[in-house]
């Protein structure tokens, strides 16, 4: 419920007004993060989906930057500390925070992989450098706008 409350606050204070005004909203985390983390904590995606669909609109596009768990472990090792819930320590897979992080993040990645098959998610390789993924994203967004609105994006944006 903590994740739902956090998402609701973010939606009310940052997202809903912009959507009502007809703006395009870009988020770095939204309902798919809540679904994946809820699944990793033992809840069923369909039950989570039923709950979140009542309160939050489904995004038109979502980018899933797929990162293997081991690569995520290496990135996390560079931080000064792992956050308790991000490491899944509340799940107590292991007393060792790194083992726990690995087990929890494996479940999160499994959830995202499952969601990517059934949702409007565009999968990008998070192992690639930003200068390679940025043009891919621009192309995908451009194709979406062309298809949905008959508009081309301005080059260079």
Question: Residues of each region from the PLM?
Answer:
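Short beta->alpha linker loops
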Residues: 6, 30, 67, 128-132
């Amino acid at each position: 419920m903590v994740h739902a409350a956090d998402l609701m606050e973010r939606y009310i204070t940052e997202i809903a007004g912009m959507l009502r005004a007809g703006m395009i909203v870009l988020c770095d985390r939204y309902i798919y993060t809540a679904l994946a983390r809820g699944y990793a904590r033992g809840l069923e995606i369909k039950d989570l989906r039923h709950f979140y669909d009542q309160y939050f609109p489904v995004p038109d596009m979502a980018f899933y930057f797929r990162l293997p768990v081991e690569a995520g472990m290496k990135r996390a090792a560079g931080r000064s500390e792992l956050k308790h819930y991000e490491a899944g320590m509340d799940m107590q897979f292991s007393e060792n925070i790194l083992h726990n992080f690995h087990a929890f993040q494996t479940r999160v990645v499994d959830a995202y992989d499952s969601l990517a098959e059934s949702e409007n998610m565009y999968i990008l390789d998070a192992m690639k450098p930003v200068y390679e993924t940025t043009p891919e994203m621009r192309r995908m967004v451009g194709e979406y706008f062309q298809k949905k609105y008959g508009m081309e994006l301005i080059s260079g944006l």
